[in-house]
Swiss-Prot record:
This is Proteasome-activating nucleotidase. ATPase which is responsible for recognizing, binding, unfolding and translocation of substrate proteins into the archaeal 20S proteasome core particle. Is essential for opening the gate of the 20S proteasome via an interaction with its C-terminus, thereby allowing substrate entry and access to the site of proteolysis. Thus, the C-termini of the proteasomal ATPase function like a 'key in a lock' to induce gate opening and therefore regulate proteolysis. The keyword Chaperone applies. One of its GO terms (biological process) is protein unfolding. GO terms for cellular component: cytoplasm; proteasome-activating nucleotidase complex.
Length: 396
């Protein structure tokens, strides 16, 4: 074979190799282009669907008044007349009940969609997402009260079969009453931590509204939210803000508070005592509460949370000093000289004792620090009480 022929064959083989490599590259590009084409076709389909949806005419919002047997229902447009309309075949009938919010076709007024229930953002904000970090071990001197609270709230939620076997209904609600700073709110937080339930906390004054009917609507939506999130514990702090005794002569604002109270009474009458919604309320002024609120069937169990006795004060001091470095501190002496102090006072005393130690650049707390803290906390309270009393005597 001549040199020219050898050169020709080498060039031919190289060219064939090049063409094969080029074919593989083109095939890869074709596959990539086909994948891009499929992706763009899906995007085009999505955009066309979105465009079609946006071009649909708006629907009316209405409320179901009554569901009829022949695939029809009576609905009411907001602030408008009532209509007998058809129900679209894709609507789930078991979810279509009186009070449900629905979308109505603009031409035929047929029910075409079920809408979620509307709730005031204030009500949604009442739900506590994270469980409080307070446990039963963080509460001192309230063993009897904690036992009664757990029997009334925790036991029916965890073991409802016990009440069914005995044949009694558990309490619907519990009222905690007593002086300020004695642990009422702390008990509710500890219960919410221990029970695997939704915890809704609301202060009574948050349910008072300016315009007619707003407070009652908030109470209704509060209980609706509790039923949806069941099992649920509703804690109403400072309930005397809406639960005070009703008088014959009232102003416009007081009448609105009375409407809110009546809605609360109606809601508590309306739910099953064996259900998964429990109500706890707290107040410092049980003497001004309306008698209708305290009758059996509403707040069935009244639990007094008094000022702690000597043993209670000692337990509370142990709770608040368990992470403190103490040196030659006799807590029994501190408990003895703090008669009449609340749990909040004792916590303040422990904090002030620590502040006295920090002031002197010490990492431990002594008996002298506690004695100075007792004088500072309880002494200031007594001085303030004397000033208020003398002011009332002088000025009436």
């Amino acid at each position: 074979m001549s040199g020219d022929e050898v050169q020709f064959h080498e060039n031919y083989d190289d060219y064939i190799t090049y063409l094969k490599r080029r074919i593989r590259q083109l095939e890869l590009q074709v596959r990539m282009l086909e994948a891009d084409k499929e992706r763009l076709e899906r995007e085009l389909s999505r955009l066309r669907s979105e465009m079609s949806r946006l071009r649909q005419p708006p629907a009316f919002a209405g409320t179901v008044i009554e569901v009829l047997d022949d695939d029809r229902a009576i609905v009411q447009n907001y602030n408008g007349p009532r209509f007998v309309v058809r129900i679209a075949p894709w609507i789930e009938r078991d979810k279509l009940r009186p009070g449900a919010r629905v979308a109505l076709d603009q031409r035929t007024m047929a029910i075409i969609e079920l809408l979620p229930s509307s709730k005031d953002p204030t009500v949604l904000g009442f739900e506590v997402i994270e469980r409080p970090n307070v446990t039963y071990n963080d509460i001192g001197g309230l063993k009897k009260q904690l036992q009664e609270l757990r029997e009334a709230i925790e036991l029916p939620l965890k073991h409802p079969e016990l009440f069914e076997e005995v044949g009694i209904d558990p309490p619907k609600g519990v009222l905690l009453y007593g002086p300020p700073g004695c642990g009422k709110t702390l008990m509710a937080k500890a219960l919410a931590h221990e029970v695997n339930a939704t915890f809704i906390r609301v202060v009574g004054s948050e349910l008072v509204r300016k315009y007619i009917g707003e407070g009652a609507r908030l109470v209704h939506e509060l209980f609706e939210l509790a039923k949806e999130k069941a099992p649920t514990i509703i804690f109403i702090d400072e309930i005397d803000a809406i639960g005070a005794k009703r008088m014959d002569e009232t102003t416009g604002g007081e009448r609105e508070v009375n409407r809110t109270l009546m809605q609360l009474l109606a809601e508590m009458d309306g739910f099953d005592p064996r259900g998964n919604v429990k109500v706890i309320a707290a107040t410092n002024r049980p003497d001004i509460l309306d008698p209708a609120l305290l009758r059996p069937g509403r707040f069935d169990r009244l639990i007094e949370v008094p000022l702690p006795d000597f043993e209670g004060r000692l337990e509370i001091l142990k709770v608040h000093t368990r992470r403190m470095k103490l040196k030659n501190v006799d807590l029994r002496v501190i408990a003895e000289i703090t008669e009449g102090a609340s749990g909040a006072d004792l916590k303040a005393i422990a904090t002030e004792a620590g502040m006295f130690a920090i002031r002197e650049r010490r990492t431990y707390v002594t008996q002298e620090d506690f004695l100075k803290a007792v004088d500072k906390v309880l002494g200031n309270e007594r001085k303030l009480l004397q000033q208020i009393t003398s002011h009332e005597i002088i000025y009436g």
